[in-house]
A protein has these predicted regions:
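Catalytic active-site module of serine/aspartate enzymes centered on a nucleophile-bearing elbow/loop
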Residues: 245-293
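Alpha/beta-hydrolase-fold enzymes
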Residues: 103, 107-192
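Conserved alpha/beta-hydrolase
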Residues: 47-71
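Catalytic nucleophile-loop/oxyanion-hole region of alpha/beta-hydrolase
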Residues: 37-40, 66-96, 100
Length: 293
């Protein structure tokens, strides 16, 4: 199955690109939010896995990413991402219908966007959210001088393009994944002082408003993540568990992109098993009870 390409108008009328992998009679639809510097096309293999399970997949390219318009790695306000996602959800519902069960899946920056979206739109009719290594704390060491400079540039030159310093080798143990990432013309390594500052501010907001996220959550935590702190993912899951059903899967020794690791088949199986419990035979029926673990 080949994904189709389309565009729509995001917040502020920016042109945003998305891909969709529709199955003939879907049992549910999954909305995917990608990470910093990448794009929705990198989730094609996952979309194929979902298609075989009867799930349609829609993957947005965030503004400043992939085929979407906008300066690479820049956003004036993080809330733009959040509002873009709501407009995208409405677009997806217009295509598949509002009665189809909806699942969210967000990776890294996309996970943070999804958390803040679900906190700001608590009434969204979704069955649950899969958070893959959500950006809840940066593991990469940032020199103190660079952090101070970014704080100044946040106001002085907010759109100044800077290098993220991301090493593709720490994304996955699979050399083919790493090489494909390096060769991908739609991948970028840019971040601006404004986006850097907005990310840190929104991480604080995610923890402060954890009780506002009321959906069932599957948290995927790679223990050897060198980009996002696993301990803060665990802390967020523990805080969230007070209000919402949360299942945590920790993957020993895996790097940041658990969906692209050498053992991805077992990760995908975990996701599909969790989704199955969220979408009973009759979409109008209440989801099956799930124990937190």
């Amino acid at each position: 199955m080949r994904g189709a390409h389309a565009y729509f108008s995001g917040s502020g009328n920016i042109r945003l690109h998305y891909r969709c992998w529709d199955v003939p009679t879907p049992r549910a639809v999954v909305i995917v939010c990608h990470g910093l510097g990448e794009h929705g096309g990198r989730y094609e293999e996952l979309a194929q896995d979902f298609a075989r399970a009867g799930l349609s997949t829609y993957a947005l390219d965030h503004r400043g990413h992939g085929r979407s318009d906008g300066r690479r790695g820049h956003v004036r306000r993080f809330t733009r991402y959040v509002h873009d996602l709501e407009k995208f959800r409405r677009r997806v519902y217009g295509a598949v219908g509002p009665d189809l069960p909806l699942i969210f899946l967000g990776h890294s920056l996309g996970g943070l966007i999804m958390i803040r979206y679900l906190q700001e739109y608590p009434g969204v009719p979704a069955r649950g959210a899969v958070l893959s290594a959500p950006l809840l704390g940066v593991a990469m060491e940032v020199p103190q001088w660079k952090a101070r400079l970014s704080s100044i540039l946040y106001y002085a030159i907010p759109a100044l393009p800077m290098n993220t310093g991301l090493d593709p080798e720490v994304l996955s143990h699979d050399p083919q994944v790493v090489e494909a990432y390096k060769r991908d013309a739609l991948v970028h390594d840019r971040i601006t002082p404004r986006l850097y500052g907005e990310i840190h501010s929104e991480i604080d907001q995610a923890f402060a408003k954890v009780s506002q996220l009321r959906l069932p959550v599957l948290m995927l935590i790679p223990s050897a993540d060198k980009l996002v702190r696993p301990d803060l993912m665990q802390r967020f899951a523990a805080d969230l568990r007070r209000k919402s059903p949360v299942q945590v899967r920790t993957f020993a020794g895996l790097y940041h992109e658990v969906l692209n690791e050498t053992t991805r088949s077992s990760v995908v199986a975990d996701i599909l098993g969790w989704i199955e419990r969220r979408i009973p035979e009759h979409s109008g029926s209440p989801p099956a009870a799930e124990s937190a673990s």
